[in-house]
């Protein structure tokens, strides 16, 4: 897209994480939740996908072509080297298919809408990198998601409610063992423990792929 760069989200994620990392004072802490979905592509409900792309107002011809592509998939099983019938999946996108990543991002618009709805009434507040900067509440990297909010039990419960609703609609389940949390230094220990019980393991994103600062700098130089 004109005026957009492939590393824009990465830079925003890095700057927001830096803001959280240097926060040492204040009554409320800041936090980030790096989500890991179990079998993200394989659990997509095709009915949900159709509802989302219709809500986005895409043309009927395009919707029909896409749904035909994802609903006519079948697999053959070889037993002792011989094909033994076909298996027709009831859900899921084929990982590696050129269009699958784009369709998954369209599905993620549902999660974005749920978060924005909570933001609109002040139940979830994002993290701003400066006093006058707009708050950032979430960023998506295809099937990778990161949510920013205040480190309070109230906001964490709102995030958990959003993820539960999204998971039921899309068929996704959060992998608690691989979901990571990052807190600012002024977050109370009891809050960290309470949030950990809801979400997963406390950790940093230093070694989590696109959030690695060295990789961000490398990507910027390469581009």
Predicted regions span which residues?
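Nucleotidyl polymerases of mobile genetic elements and RNA viruses
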Residues: 1-223
